[in-house]
Design a protein with these regions (language model features):
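Sec/Tat signal peptide C-region and signal peptidase I cleavage site
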Residues: 17-23
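Short, glycine-/small- and polar/acidic-enriched structural segments
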Residues: 24-162, 166, 173-183, 198-200, ...
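Pocket-lining segment of extracytoplasmic ligand-binding domains
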Residues: 84-85, 157-158, 163-255
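Phosphate-coordinating loops and pocket residues in cytosolic domains that bind phosphorylated ligands
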Residues: 125, 191, 313
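Secondary-structure end/capping motifs
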Residues: 220-301
């Protein structure tokens, strides 16, 4: 081997080592909540799946109503939230792009009512606890009301996050007739039927779908990291299938639940693998985004429609 060949090989090796080191140093801060659907993100971090793909991930628990502010300030670069929330953020000047789907709710989000309320239309003139406008619980409330001939103007909305909203129902708080919440907090209400009942969930109204996205700047500067985030998530979904006990224990611990309790709450949603992602973004995502955007405009959460064609970039799920 000539000296030139040795130098060439050394250069290739050093470049490869540098590339690995650079990938391992790719830092990304992600904003999520304790929602069951987001848990594979936590699993991917805690089980070292993100790290194996060259990511240094920091997860921050941020209420949905504040997550876009954290993105705008640069505190986080990526987040998980519902499909319609990305519409709100972009319409309000917080540029973000969805890159993969996390989950679909199959009864994991719902409306809880006090005894005596027989149907959703009975809520006219009543008080409902829900997160602030621009969040999934508020959107779910608006969606369910619309499907039953009402609007948010027909009820009084008091702003409570999903966990305290569920707790208010369980405690029988006076002045709260209904509440919008989701798993794992919805199961706490299921266990207390005397406090109220679940009158509707996303089994009745299939409209909660969560996706993961980042700022356009982060995606442009870190395309490999974006791909690693998607692949790390798919690794986590695969791990849930191959080592369920360990996976549920890790995910449950993050929300102070046993693995068994967390597994119970997960039965009301479905995490989406790569094949499901590709199918979702082939048509359903755009169709739902249009319907959701129209409702958001109608209820005054947004003042103008963002460019719906720029809400997602599907190259990272291939």
């Amino acid at each position: 081997m000539t000296p030139i060949h040795k130098l060439a090989i050394a250069a290739v090796l050093s470049t490869g080592i540098a590339s690995v080191a650079q990938a391992q140093d790719t830092k990304v801060a992600i904003g999520i909540s304790g929602w069951t659907g987001f848990a594979p993100i936590t699993l991917a971090k805690e089980a070292g799946l993100f790290q194996k793909r060259g990511l240094d991930v920091t997860i921050k628990k941020i209420p949905q109503k504040d997550r876009h502010l954290a993105i705008a300030s640069g505190d986080i670069q990526c987040a998980a939230t519902t499909v319609e929330t990305w519409i709100v953020w972009n319409a309000n000047g917080v540029a973000t792009t969805q890159i993969f789907q996390l989950d679909k709710s199959y009864g994991a989000d719902g409306m809880v009512v006090k005894p005596g309320i027989a149907k959703i239309s009975d809520l006219k003139g009543k008080t409902v606890a829900a997160s602030a406008p621009g969040t999934a619980p508020y959107f779910t409330l608006a969606w369910m009301l619309k499907k039953n001939g009402l609007t948010t103007k027909d009820v009084t909305v008091v702003n409570l996050e999903p966990q305290p909203a569920a707790n208010a129902m369980i405690a029988g708080t006076s002045g709260v007739d209904a509440a919008m919440t989701y798993e794992p907090y919805l199961s706490a209400v299921r266990a207390k039927p005397e406090a109220g009942r679940i009158i509707a969930t996303t089994l009745d109204y299939p409209m909660i779908m969560d996706t993961f996205g980042c700022t356009p700047q982060f995606l442009a500067q870190n395309p490999r990291a974006a791909k690693a985030l998607a692949d790390g998530y798919f690794d986590a979904v695969a791990m849930i299938g191959s080592d369920a006990k360990k996976s549920f224990e890790i995910m449950g611990a993050d929300v102070k639940q046993s693995g068994e309790a967390f597994e119970g709450s997960s039965k009301y949603l479905r995490w989406q693998d790569r094949a499901a992602n590709q199918k979702f973004f082939a048509g359903e995502h755009a169709q739902f985004s249009k319907e959701a955007a129209d409702l958001l405009l109608e209820i005054g959460v947004i003042k103008q429609l963002p460019d719906l064609s720029k809400l997602a970039d599907t190259q990272f799920i291939r």
